[in-house]
A protein has these predicted regions:
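Conserved N-terminal segment of class I S-adenosyl-L-methionine
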Residues: 1-97, 101-105, 118, 192-195, ...
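A short His-aromatic
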Residues: 106-110
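S-adenosyl-L-methionine-dependent methyltransferase catalytic module, highlighting the catalytic core
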Residues: 14-21, 51, 112-123, 130-234
Length: 237
């Protein structure tokens, strides 16, 4: 586990989730998650720089975050004193309370066993609680184009940015949904956002905010080929 903590600190030292288009992506995912939040409590797993955390804190619900990087934890605690910050690996977290909402934004592509993490999280839900999760989609238009141009060997191959952020895999819609089904959860909603035809670098160089917003919304119409996919899941009724 020490090696995993060291790995997380290394990634945290050069993270780009709060930079450029990545920030817009996280903010749009919050807009989607906000539609489905319920109850009075939220647990966020893997907040990184805390872009999502700041938005979740603004909902007024009691917010706990669990993050394996001490550097990220210290930064969030200093910026958002109302948030309960826990420095722990997900596997070691053992809360006494249960949560109405558990948010995993860009988390499951990082962990060794995503289905096991989802199963852990399911045990921390209130009876009416929900897990809200989002990940990059291997079937995104920009990945399909990269394969055709021979820039990637396969749609689910790790690209330069995946490696930079310590991703262990790139999900497709089927493998993403399977994480929740394997954990015994019921998938209430599957969707996507961010119809992404180009790389972040190309988009940041030429696109206007209006273009970004339009293509974020278009991804909701075409989830199977959107840049990001999401699931809202709950305990079986």
């Amino acid at each position: 586990m020490d090696s995993e903590r060291e790995r997380l600190e290394r990634i945290a030292g050069n993270s780009l989730y709060a930079a450029g288009v990545n920030t817009d992506t996280v903010r749009y995912s919050f807009r989607i998650f906000a539609r489905y939040l319920r109850g009075e409590s939220i647990l966020e797993l893997g907040p990184a720089e805390g872009v999502m955390t700041e938005l979740l804190a603004g909902t007024g619900k009691a917010l706990t975050v669990v993050e394996g990087s001490r550097a990220f934890c210290d930064a969030i605690a200093a910026r958002l004193p109302s948030v309960r910050v826990v420095n722990a690996l997900f596997e070691d977290f053992a809360p006494a309370e249960r949560f109405d909402n558990i948010v995993l934004g860009h988390v499951l592509e990082h962990v060794e066993d995503p289905a096991a993490i989802v199963a852990h999280a399911a045990a921390w839900l209130t009876p009416q609680g929900r897990i809200l999760a989002a990940v990059p989609n291997s079937r995104s238009l920009h990945r399909q184009a990269a394969v055709i141009m021979k820039l990637l060997p396969a749609e689910d191959a790790l690209n330069e940015m995946d490696v930079h952020h310590g991703h262990r895999r790139v999900f497709d819609p089927e493998s993403f949904r399977q994480c929740f089904l394997a954990a015994g959860l019921a998938i209430e909603i599957f969707g996507g956002y961010w119809l992404k035809p180009l790389s972040n670098r190309q988009i940041e160089a030429t696109w206007t905010p209006q273009m970004l917003e339009a293509f974020m919304q278009l991804g909701e119409r075409y989830p199977d080929i959107a840049g990001e996919i999401y699931v809202v899941a709950a305990l079986p009724r």
